[in-house]
Amino acid sequence: VTDTAPRPTLEAVAARAGVSRATVSRVVNGGDGVRDVLVERVRKAVEELGYVPNQAARSLVTRRHDAVAVVVAEPETRVFADPFFALQLRGISKELTAHDNQLVLLLTEGRDDHARVGRYLAGGHVDGALVFSLHLDDPLPELIQRAGVPTVFGGRPGWSGDRRDVVYVDSDNRGGARDAVRHLVGLGRTRIAHLTGALDQTSAVDRLDGYRDVMVDADPRLIVEADFTPAGGERAMRQLLDRCPDVDAVFAANDLTASGALRVLREAGRRVPDDVAVIGFDDMLPVAEQTDPPLTTVRQDIEEMGRLMARLLLRDLDRGTSHEGVAGTPAGVVLPTTLVRRASA
């Protein structure tokens, strides 16, 4: 059954509250200059009548859509298979919801998708954008800059040159990697390998650099490129065992890569951690707790990264300034990491 009752109007709210239509409009749209007693009367009338502001009309007044685009530079097959994205999206969604903003999810896989997203952002449909999982050759930053949309990036941007206008939230990938490798060294391991992430992403590059900070003279054959996926971890681990059968420890670029490596080690009859110690990165639950054995890993607060990205963007939108213009606030925010010890190392 369809409810055909007319929606309450601005005029009806004004009549109920005993104020002018202009006063109701200012209160509903967050304007200043209305006495507290009148604000309370308007809010009471809105609640009693069930009045819902017309978003299109409200946007004309506030120049805000109360919508934020979340752009993930990955195909949907990876986004919906990797818990990392779910955790980051959950953090973003919680923060946006708390401020009555809508999340508009945009995924990009190829050139056509990039052009589509660029047109959408330039079309004025959203107030700002949150962008993560960028690749070094990604055209999205240029498209976003052209669109003139306030943006916060997830992860350290990989562009060359001084871009002080870039706002980003990241984890201490390099420091976390150093902690992981130092732990393996402390266990007495000497043939410590690294299964990297996709090296066109700064998180993978930073973790590789952290490994190299500790393993200065490491055999280059101990570094094998993977792609942050379980299948990539399996391929890289098989390649590593062929190259360096004497490997006694593995630092994997993320937990999914580590889970693939653990499967291959088990198939090869290598005991973990007796024969080969394994450490991951992320501490994604339940993945890290359900591997066999449970995974020692570097914890980054993925959900908090998402919340902080959204918080920075909303704060800048409220102030009507770029993040760079906010005194005392750095353009890049780097969150700490922690080594979580379980049975694998």
List each language-model region with its residue ranges:
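Glycine-rich phosphate-binding loop signature in dinucleotide/nucleotide-binding domains
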Residues: L49, L187-G188, L240-D246
